[in-house]
Swiss-Prot record:
Job of this protein: Potential calcium-dependent cell-adhesion protein. May be involved in the establishment and maintenance of specific neuronal connections in the brain.
Positions of the UniProt region annotated as 6 X 4 AA repeats of P-X-X-P: 734-894
Official protein name in the record: Protocadherin alpha-13
Residue ranges annotated for the Cadherin domain, each copy included: 34-133, 134-242, 243-350, 351-455, 456-565, 581-678
SMART domains linked: CA (SM00112)
Organism, as annotated: Homo sapiens
Sugar-bearing residue positions: 257, 265, 548
PXXP repeat copies, ranges: 734-737, 774-777, 799-802, 832-835, 873-876, 891-894
Gene that encodes it: PCDHA13
Membrane topology: Single-pass type I membrane protein
Annotated transmembrane regions: 698-718
Amino acid sequence: MLSSWQGGPRPRQLLLWLLILAAWETGSGQLHYSVPEEAKHGTFVGRIAQDLGLELAELVPRLFRVASKRHGDLLEVNLQNGILFVNSRIDREELCGRSAECSIHLEVIVDRPLQVFHVEVKVRDINDNPPIFPESKKRIIIAESRPPETRFPLDGASDADIGVNSALTYRLDPNDYFTLDAQNSLEQMSSLSLVLRKTLDREEIQEHSLLLTASDGGKPELTGTVQLLITILDVNDNAPEFYQSVYKVTVLENAFNGTLVIKLNATDPDDGTNGDIVYSFRRPVWPAVVYAFTINPNNGEIRTKGKLDFEEKKLYEISVEAVDKGNIPMAGHCTLLVEVLDVNDNAPEVTITSLSLPIREDTQPSAIIALISVSDRDSGSNGQVTCTLTPHVPFKLVSTYKNYYSLVLDSALDRESVSAYELVVTARDGGSPSLWATASVSVGVADVNDNAPAFAQPEYTVFVKENNPPGCHIFTVSAQDADAQENALVSYSLVERRVGERALSSYVSVHAESGKVYALQPLDHEELELLQFQVSARDSGVPPLGSNVTLQVFVLDENDNAPALLTPGAGSAGGTVSELMPRSVGAGHVVAKVRAVDADSGYNAWLSYELQLAAVGARIPFRVGLYTGEISTTRPLDEVDAPHHRLLVLVKDHGEPALTATATVLLSLVESGQAPQASSRASAGAVGPEAALVDVNVYLIIAICAVSSLLVLTLLLYTALRCSAPPTEGACAPGKPTLVCSSAAGSWSYSQQRRPRVCSGEGPHKTDLMAFSPSLPPCLGSAEGTGQREEDSECLKEPRQPNPDWRYSASLRAGMHSSVHLEEAGILRAGPGGPDQQWPTVSSATPEPEAGEVSPPVGAGVNSNSWTFKYGPGNPKQSGPGELPDKFIIPGSPAIISIRQEPTNSQIDKSDFITFGKKEETKKKKKKKKGNKTQEKKEKGNSTTDNSDQ
C-alpha cells in the first residue's frame, strides 16, 4: 500500500481533491452581516435569499434551512420573504467575552442540487455594562506621620464592554488632602493611585470619606463608584495641656482628711496610649505639701492628707505635672495655689415666741402672728445674722430691732384654698462660708363661714310616672359647702309655696340631711303635669348661708283613664245615641257619629272605633271610621233592610293595656218624604220605646237649633257694636286679634298681645281663638303702635307665618314625638322621596287640601288645651262679616266644634268631628236654592247645637 500511495495513484487523488475544492468554492459563497447586541426580536439582519441569488419560490421546495453549531436559535430566516432576523436575545459579552471580534457563523443548506453557503453575522458591541469596582467600600489606613506625595495603590474598575465603551476615566471628590493619579493603557487601566497632598492631622480629622467614580466612553456613559474610607492612625505628637497655667483654690482649716481640694484635668488630643495621662507633684516637692496633700495619678484629684492650720500656714504653692504614655513621653505643667480659710464654726440660733395660733381666715393684713429673735456666738462678719422666710406665702418678716423680727400677715387668707402654712425661718450669718439655722412653725387657718352651699347646677328636671306610691323617692339634691366642720354641715328644706289651692308640702317633702325628695301622695298627670318648686340648702354656720335649686318635676302619663263617651243631649242615656235616617241614602252617607274623649295624653288618649257585630258572620250595611267615629253606610239601603238597627261601637285607646268603652247607636229608617212625627207614630206600636226616643230627639234638635240661632244673632250684634265703637286701650279693633288663654282653673284672660292670625283676601280680619296649656306662662299684654294698620294691609295679601315666640307645652312636646298613623285623616302626603308621614289634621268641610287644619289630631297624644287653629297655604279661609271661625276648641277637651255644615257629597274620610245626620236635609235645601244668608244661619245653628251637646 505504501508503494501504491507513493506511486501513480497519489497525483490523481490530489488532483481529484483540488477539483472538488474548486467546485465547492464555485457552488458555495460567504455572506457578511452585522447586528447590534441586545437587538429586539424580529430585528432585520439581511435579505439572505436575495443575497444568495435564490428565488423566494424555491426556498421551500429546495428545503432551505439554516444551521449553526452553538447558536442556531439566535437568528432565523423567514421563508416567505427570505429575510434573516433576530430570533432571541443576543448578548455579546456572553457569546465572546472580552474578545475584540464577535461573530455568529451560520451554514445555509439547500437541496436539488445540494448547496452550502457560509454566513457570518458580526455582533456589534453597545454600551450596556457599567464599570464595576471589586468592592463598594474600600478601607485604607494611613498614619498621620506619612509625608506628602505618598502614593497608595487602588484597584481599578472593570467594564465588560469593548472598545470605546470600555475606556474608563476616574474622578475623585474634591478634598484638601488627597488627589488621584491614573495612568491609562490602550486596553484597560494599568495603574490607579491615591496621592497624599499635605500632612495629615488625626486630631483635626480622624477619618476621611471620599467617593471614587469610574465612567466609560459610551454614549450615554455609564458610571460605577466605590467609597474610600481612609482612617488616620495616631502618632504621639501632642503633649498634655491644662486648661489654666495657675489654679487658685481655698480650703477650710477644719477640712477632714480626704477632702477634695481640686480636680485637675489635662487633655491630650492623641489617641490610645498616646493620650493616657499620669498626674504627679513636680519635683522638687516641699515636705509640707507632701504632708498636707495627696494627688491621684489617674484622675488628677488633690485631697487633704493631714490637718491644716490657718495660723501656721495660710497658702500652699504646688507644681503639678501631667505626662502621657507615648513611646516618647511628653509632659505638661501647672501651678496650684491653695489658700487655707478661717472656719466659721458657730451656727446662728433662732427662737420663736408669742405665738397666737391658729388664726382666723378673716384676720386683717398687718396683724402680728409671732415674735422671732436670733443670735450667733461668732464675732465679726461671722456673727452678723440675717433672717429670711419661706417665699410665696401671705406672711412676711419685719425687723423691729437688731436681731429681733416680727412675723406679720401680709395678705388676706382663704382657708378653702390653703388650710395651713408650714413656715420656715432661716437665719444666716455673714461668715465665709456662712452657717445657718432654721426654725419651723405651722400656722393653721381657722374656718369662717364665708361660703354658701352650692349645687352642681341651678335647675334639675325630674320625670315621674303618675300614680306613684305615696312616699316614693323621686330625686336627690346635693349641695357642697367649701367650708369646714359645722360651717359645711348642710341641711335641706322646701321653699314653701302654693300649688293651685294646696300647699307645696302636701305634694313633696325633702329629707333635711340626705336631700332626698319624696312624693307624699300619688301624682295625677291629668291634674298636674308640671310641679316646679325650689329646695333650699343652708349650712350650720353663724350666720347661716344658703342657696336654692329649682326642680321641675314632669308627671308622665299612664293609661289610667278609660275613654268617656260624649252624649249628644241631656236626655240621652249614657253611651246611647238615637238617630233617624231616610232609606234613600246612598253608600258612604254619614248617619251618626260617636264622640269620646280620654283624659290621658299621648298614645293613651289616641282613640280608635270598632263596630261590634251582634252575631258572628252577620253583615250590616254600616261601618264606623277607625279614628273619626263616624258611622256611614256601606251600600244603598233597600226595602229588605230592617227598619231599626242597634249598633255597638267599641271605643279603645292605645295605652298598655288598652282601656275601652262601648256606645250604643239606635238607627231608625224612615221613608223619603215621611215626616219624622208620622214615622214615629206609625212605628210606635212595633218599636215601642225606640219610637218614643226618636220623637224626643226630633223635638230636642228643634229646640237646640232655635237656641243656637238666638245665640248666633246675639254674638253678631255684640261684635257689630264693639267694632263700630271708637277703639280704646284693650278694645276690639280691626287688625288686632284677640288672644284667649286658658288657665288651670278654666278661666279666660284677654290681652292685646300680637299673635299669628289668619287673614283673608276680602272682608274684615278674623278673630283667632288660641288655647294654651296650663303649664305655659300666663298671657302678657303688649301695646300696639301706629304701624298696626300698615301691617294689617300687608296681612290681607298673604298668610302670616306662625309666631316663633310660641312654645308647645310639655304634654304637646311629648305627644308630638309619637308617630300617628290615621287611616282616614289623610296623613300621608306625597313628597320627593315618597310618602311623608305627618300629623293628621282636622279640616273643614271642603275636600281641598287648602282647607283649615288643626294640628296635631284629636286623641293623638296632645293635650287639647295646646291646639291652635291654622289655615292651609293655598286658599285662605273666606269669611263674611260677623262670621265666627268654622271651628273652635273646647278647653280641656280634644273635641273641636264645627260650625259649617258638611256638604252632602262628603266622604267618610273627612275629619269633621260632630254631625247629627242632617246632610240629607241640607241637600234638599240646596236643591230648593234658598238664600245664602238663611242657609248659613241654619248651618251655624246646627254647629251651635253640637256645641251644646258637648
